[in-house]
Amino acid sequence: MHKIFSKNNLIFFVFVAFIFVVIVLQFFVSSENATKVNLSQTFEPISWLHLLGTDDYGRDLFTRIIIGARSTLFVTVLTLIAIVVIGVTLGLFAGYKKGWIERLVLRFIDVGLSIPEFIIMIALASFFQPSLWNLVISITVIKWMNYTRLTRSIVNSEMNKPYIKMAQLFHVPTRTILIRHLTPKIIPAIIVLMVVDFGKIILYISSLSFIGLGAQPPTPEWGAMLQQGRDFISSHPIMLIAPASVIAITILIFNLTGDALRDRLLKQRGEYDESH
């Protein structure tokens, strides 16, 4: 048990430290250096002045990665907020109201989840003009379904419990039951899913930008930087390795944090497997 607790604490520390470092570094770099073209300094090697060198337009790679974190993480957070609001709201009503609302939502989810997520995202993003904002729409349209299904499942498990029955017996308003009684039961599981999905959404955003459906030059964004670095993989591999490494590390941190949160949630419910 102590090992589990220590492992989770270490993961949380790494997670918080990562977010802190990203935020602090924003104050030490200029967004102008991330987009300003300087053809006299193209492909500068790694140095104290340019920690990761410069790209084919003379822009500092380290600065572009830090500013790119702002773009990628902001869009990811915005997407998650939209997903949670839509998914949890539909899940609450589908689980509580039952009837045709539940059947309609479930049939829609069954159809949506039967198709690979990324294929749908590519199809949707292709209909819009490439931009980070359109990625928010494309990802939200498909990802809310997981949150609706999870929320409905939790609501169904709570509906037969005495406190809900008593609330209904005393004609407590539906809004009060949903917000004050059911929502607190949903929040822990939703937070775990959000943290796990954070890494997935970063990967989706980077992948869509990589194939030209997301951020457009000169906007610094990790996926767009991957696309740019691909053309110089032989002569200047750092242009590809740097953004790829940042994406991989970020996704790993959020995945480990999600696993740790899930373990703690199961432990609190008495469902934790000691051999895990």
UniProtKB/Swiss-Prot annotation:
Subunit structure: The complex is composed of two ATP-binding proteins (NikD and NikE), two transmembrane proteins (NikB and NikC) and a solute-binding protein (NikA).
Transmembrane segments: 10-30, 73-93, 108-128, 186-206, 238-258
Alphabetical list of PROSITE patterns matching this protein: ABC_TM1 (PS50928)
Source organism of the structure: Staphylococcus aureus (strain N315)
Subcellular location(s) of the protein: Cell membrane
PANTHER family reported for this sequence: D,D-DIPEPTIDE TRANSPORT SYSTEM PERMEASE PROTEIN DDPC-RELATED, OLIGOPEPTIDE TRANSPORT SYSTEM PERMEASE PROTEIN APPC
Domain ABC transmembrane type-1 intervals: 69-258
Function: Part of the ABC transporter complex NikABCDE (Opp2) involved in nickel import. Probably responsible for the translocation of the substrate across the membrane.
Keywords annotated in UniProt: Cell membrane, Ion transport, Membrane, Nickel, Nickel transport, Transmembrane, Transmembrane helix, Transport
Full protein name: Nickel import system permease protein NikC
Family: Belongs to the binding-protein-dependent transport system permease family. OppBC subfamily.
InterPro entries: ABC_transport_permease, BP-dependent_transpt_permease, MetI-like, MetI-like_sf
Biological process terms in GO annotation: nickel cation transport; transmembrane transport
Broad class of the protein's primary localization: membrane
Species lineage: Bacteria, Bacillati, Bacillota, Bacilli, Bacillales
